[in-house]
């Protein structure tokens, strides 16, 4: 006599399970939707930080689930697939940390551990502040602006400063190189003629090297430097 227990979930049981946990599922899906839709550094930085934490948790979760699949495979084919996927997840997770530490060594910014990108922009102001910001790729042109005495770049609030504080060169760092952008144009003043309230700067990609940014003490104006 076969004493093996059938663990297959029936339709009625599945429906009952969904009825019991549908509120949790709804809240979880709403949470993910809010993170994905509003989790941008240019919109809401609190939600963006939560999004980064969730993304950081996904790799260990994938590795853990993959390890469980290797221990309890459905069949031989499933075991092979589980091993391949788990190894891929482990290598990807290790690669992320290697690249992040290389980028951190180059730019000295916690933005280096941003799982969404592999680059960090950096503006070393002449008043001693270092303003770092998230950037998805290495562009050909950067256009920081000053509005009401506040510096913005790529839509992100960086620090309070004046037009004279902007340097000749700014940088975008990647794990293997430092991209240098040189100022080619500067526009100051608004309709009232106040040159400290509004300014636009145009920086064009000038050169590429393998140097590192000098460690500059920040004035604490930005939580993200």
From Swiss-Prot:
The chain crosses the membrane at residues 21-41, 52-72, 78-98. It is found in: Virion membrane; Host Golgi apparatus membrane. One of its GO terms (cellular component) is membrane. GO terms for molecular function: structural constituent of virion. Keywords: Glycoprotein, Host Golgi apparatus, Host membrane, Membrane, Transmembrane, Transmembrane helix, Viral envelope protein, Viral matrix protein, Virion. PROSITE patterns: COV_M (PS51927). InterPro entries: GAMMA_CORONA_M, M_CoV. It is a multi-pass membrane protein. Residues 42-51, 99-225 are intravirion. It comes from the Viruses. Residues 1-20, 73-77 are virion surface. The keyword Glycoprotein applies. Belongs to the gammacoronaviruses M protein family. Homomultimer. Interacts with envelope E protein in the budding compartment of the host cell, which is located between endoplasmic reticulum and the Golgi complex. Forms a complex with HE and S proteins. Interacts with nucleocapsid N protein. This interaction probably participates in RNA packaging into the virus. Component of the viral envelope that plays a central role in virus morphogenesis and assembly via its interactions with other viral proteins. This is Membrane protein. The lineage of its organism: Viruses, Riboviria, Orthornavirae, Pisuviricota, Pisoniviricetes. The gene is M.
